[in-house]
């Protein structure tokens, strides 16, 4: 009897058009055993129903028959049946479900009698029936729709006699209607099994048959056993019982055990867990040398040196001694920095004997200066190819950018883009002096910059304005050169006139030798300006044209004087040198030598009058006038 309870419950639900699920655990059995029990209970159907009804009346225990007709009457689906049974309803084997799997409790469940309460969840899960395992697994839940042709022998298998839940047998017509509907449901079940195939029918039918056999006891045993319903909600692999007695727990355990044994071949082996590779291992950062790391993206090597003193300056990360293409070069840079910071007793990568020359070099430098020296000798850094501190090269347009770090909230400050890396390095130096004072590590010598001017400014000065005395010195030189040029240009004409008057006054008493004196005057003029030519490098013109010679000499003297003043910083008048030094009165020995040189040049100079003019003796010629006696230059020097 018990083997076909579930099967007929599902088929009766199919005949009434309801969606239902089977009240059975998952047990494994064979299809042949199910058919054997079905035929066996077909022969004993009437006798068992009468015996069950008689026992229920004697002991007062009500295990009402759960027929589809009774369910339809309870839910108001068959009006004539409800009227015949006076609104009776039974413990349902096929529960209506919503689309989400929850129970559908309809208003039609309420009784018409006001003295009786409506059905509650306890009516479905109460203790007035034998313990049953309720499973929602898809392997034993059947959903049917529609009816089929009648088939004899499946009417009452697994169903108790329809009785009122509150006492009294149901009408005999209810049993007759249930037999007809059960036969139609059996035919629908047969067609469904054929459609699903032998494999599905085997798995489903075996599970239902064995579940009914192991869970539902006989009617006689049910009279003395009172167990609560064991509710098991299974997802196919595990069963979690909410409330269950000893009998229900045993049934669920047996069902789960059989299913686990059946699936041990496929899911019993534990799959190995593959851990995902950490993202930190993207690119190797290790090196065989101490203090050297390999940049993750560029592949270049960096030398790092960590010193606790850098924490005082707000630095929270390792100091970098530059980037290198070769791992060995980076290791040697670390060794040199470590030797400077911690001495010869520290651990280094290479023998100490390899650094004897560098040890002598670093004695004259401070730590920061030597680290800056190491950085300048590196082949650039990982983010740029510049050898200067704080300078990187833009990866798109190739221009040089200057940045200084850890100046405003431990962030980098962008200083601008420059055409050359030297300009960017100067911009970094100015910013470093502004934010870090005299202890700043700069790319160039700090004496190159006007530190006081940089510190006093409210903004970052451009590099050309921050250089020490660069603008002041240039302006002074320009002013001195311009002044000297103006003086020479103003007095050039007066210079020529005074010199001409002087020569004429000297030769005036000798009128008897007019022709000879003119020649001597021409020669003396040439000799006087030859001395000036020796001093300021004036190239004289031909000596036979006096006016042309004087004009040329005056212009060349002015040009040479301006050139001399502009090329020498000591040439400015306010420095106490220059023209006073150049045109100071010579000593007697120097004057005598100049006169002798002038006489020699006068004798060697070609005369325009021809070879018939004889040269006068040295005693008859007037002495050459030295440049120290010229009134123009004497007045200018005294001023």
From Swiss-Prot:
Biological source species: Oryza sativa subsp. japonica (Rice)
CDD domains: AP2
Ranges annotated as DNA-binding: 288-351, 387-445
Cellular component GO terms held in the UniProt record: nucleus
Effect of gene knockout: Strong reduction of adventitious (crown) root formation.
Tissue-wise expression: Highly expressed at the base of the stem. Expressed in stems. Expressed a low levels in crown roots and seeds. Expressed in the stem region where adventitious (crown) root initiation occurs.
Localization in the cell: Nucleus
Biased composition (Low complexity): 43-59, 547-561
Molecular function terms from GO: DNA binding; DNA-binding transcription factor activity
Claim: Membrane is one of the keywords in the record: no
Xref: PANTHER family: AP2-LIKE ETHYLENE-RESPONSIVE TRANSCRIPTION FACTOR, AP2-LIKE ETHYLENE-RESPONSIVE TRANSCRIPTION FACTOR CRL5
Gene this chain is encoded by: CRL5
UniProt protein name: AP2-like ethylene-responsive transcription factor CRL5
Region (Disordered): 25-59, 258-277, 547-579
Function: Acts as a positive regulator of adventitious (crown) root formation by promoting its initiation. Promotes adventitious root initiation through repression of cytokinin signaling by positively regulating the two-component response regulator RR1. Regulated by the auxin response factor and transcriptional activator ARF23/ARF1.
GO biological process: adventitious root development; negative regulation of cytokinin-activated signaling pathway
Family to which the UniProt record says this protein belongs: Belongs to the AP2/ERF transcription factor family. AP2 subfamily.
One of the Pfam families matching this protein, by short name: AP2
Induction, as annotated: Induced by auxin.
Annotated InterPro entries: AP2/ERF_dom, AP2/ERF_dom_sf, DNA-bd_dom_sf
